[in-house]
A protein has these predicted regions:
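Single conserved hydrophobic/aromatic residue that forms the stacking wall/gate
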Residues: 1-12
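A gly/ser-rich beta-alpha-beta helix-loop segment of oxidoreductase catalytic cores
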Residues: 10-51, 56, 108-126, 140
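Active-site loops and adjacent core secondary-structure elements that bind or stabilize anionic groups
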Residues: 11, 170-171
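Conserved phosphate/anionic-ligand binding catalytic regions in large, soluble enzymes, centered on
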Residues: 29-38, 124-148, 316-322, 326
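Flexible inter-domain linker/hinge segments
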Residues: 75-118, 124
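Terminal amphipathic helices with adjacent charged low-complexity linkers/tails
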Residues: 144-148, 178-278, 312, 316-318, ...
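Short glycine-/aliphatic-rich beta-strand segments at the starts of folded cytosolic domains
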Residues: 151-162, 214, 275-291
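Short, conserved charged micro-motifs
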Residues: 167-170, 223-232, 296, 334-339
Length: 340
């Protein structure tokens, strides 16, 4: 938020826009390969890091960035060249295994990004991307060169209402074909808890119609407003074709949109306001699946919750098949720990 509020932020911004932006740091976001609500448009942190200056274990400072492996000095390599040669050999050696086994999901952030070491057709590699997501285990970053993009002039938001959680998850794969910047989930639990919090109750009245089981917040951005309004019309038409007539609340006014996003960005705080000893527990959070599997994945996990006599809370990044999911457990009792 500090970066966004300064001069550069008036025109350009880092597009990895995490909900914890008020306290997140660029080093931390690079270390864990952060994503944010708009990663369907702007990608993960690894897609936005151009270079990293880092300290190695021996204290030597090295600049990592785009490099052609053919340009490295093979006869008298520097520490940097020798290290990069070894990394590129790993990429060549493991290329087939990576292509065969790495999951094809947009939110793959587990482990090291060794796929970034595989030689591409154009021959240029960027080993800085290996450091992204490594959480300080490979080197200590001292400076980070980021790709910045213009802030869109206009934004619009469609709040899509669904009578069941399964239908919301199944519909996501269709909604993303409209090329939105974000598709974010708000489930029934968050809606009900937010209604009990004065800070959010009045805001919900403006964009929640009736008693939906789930909401999907679909955002479009661009340089002109009229095409975005047309996108909202397309969204409503698609919802109707999926069987959900008159199920979209339009948010065109920026102040109205902010109220909607305020609720979504406070998702964790809202969930943790659950009264009593039963609380959403983070133990299986942030699994990512392909969108075609999202409805089945969430359905099977809900059945697992039922098997153990509990429920789960769900919210966040439906657009890329990565939801924040937490089973509701009483960790003050042995049974809660056992179920976890």
């Amino acid at each position: 938020d500090t970066i966004q509020s300064r001069g550069l932020g008036d025109v350009y911004k880092r597009q990895v826009d995490v909900s914890t932006s008020s306290r997140a740091t660029l080093g931390g976001m690079t270390g864990n390969n952060s994503c944010g609500a708009r990663s369907i448009r702007y990608g993960k942190m690894v897609d936005n890091v151009l270079g990293v200056e880092a300290l190695l274990q021996n204290g030597e400072k090295i600049q990592f960035g785009e490099v052609d492996p053919k340009s490295l000095n093979g006869k008298h390599p520097s520490t940097r060249d020798h290290l990069l040669q070894q990394l590129f050999q790993i990429g060549i050696r493991e290329a087939d295994e990576v292509r065969q086994r790495f999951p094809e999901v947009q939110r793959r952030v587990g482990g090291y990004n060794i796929d970034e070491l595989i030689p591409p057709d154009h021959g240029v590699l960027n080993p800085a991307r290996l450091l992204v997501g490594s959480e300080g285990t490979l080197a200590f970053s001292t400076s980070i060169h980021l790709k910045l993009q213009p802030i869109p002039t206009h934004k619009v938001l469609g709040v899509c209402h669904f009578p069941s959680f399964y239908e919301a998850m199944d519909s996501t794969q269709h909604l993303v074909t409209l090329n939105p910047d974000a598709v974010e989930l708000v489930d029934r639990t968050m809606i009900e808890l937010a209604r009990s919090i004065p800070q959010f109750a009045e805001k919900l009245k403006k964009f929640v119609m009736g008693e939906p089981d789930s909401l999907l917040l679909v955002e479009f951005t661009g340089e002109e407003l009229k095409p975005l309004q047309a996108k909202l019309s397309e969204l409503k038409a698609m919802m109707a074709s999926l069987g959900f007539q008159d199920a979209v609340v339009e948010a065109i006014d920026p102040a109205f949109q902010k109220e909607v996003w305020d609720v979504r960005k406070s998702g964790l705080n809202i969930m943790m306001s659950m009264k009593g000893d039963d609380k959403p527990v983070s133990c299986i959070e942030d699994c990512a699946v392909e969108l075609k599997d999202l409805a089945e994945y969430t359905s099977r996990l809900n059945h697992l919750f039922e098997k153990y006599g509990t429920t789960g809370t769900w919210y966040a990044h439906a657009s890329v098949g990565c939801l924040h999911v937490r089973p509701v457990l009483n960790m003050k009792k042995e049974q809660g720990a056992s179920v976890m």
